[in-house]
Amino acid sequence: MQTIFVDMEPIMVQLLQGNAVAMTVEVQVKIETEGQDNAVFLTRQMPKISDAFVRDLYAFMPRMLKTKKRIDVLILKQRLQVVGERLMGRGLIKDILVQSKIGTPAG
């Protein structure tokens, strides 16, 4: 089967400190799957996938930054893989590629 990469819109997560936005993180992700049928299915499911990723990262990123003091791309990739598999089932998402992550301080 042919490996296909499905592009996602950038994921934007605002990290809060107190009642204010401390940083905005933008993550560019591609989802790896096999076969055109799977790619079409994932593309149709993208609103659900994107929503699940954003919801999870809002809770997960502050915890990661607290322990790691930085955004760890490998941990982020593994986390999104788990979230994707929970949502879509095992085997559909072969891999998650985190192409870039940009943290912009607020203000």
Language-model regions, residue ranges each:
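Flexible, low-complexity charged segments
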Residues: 1-107
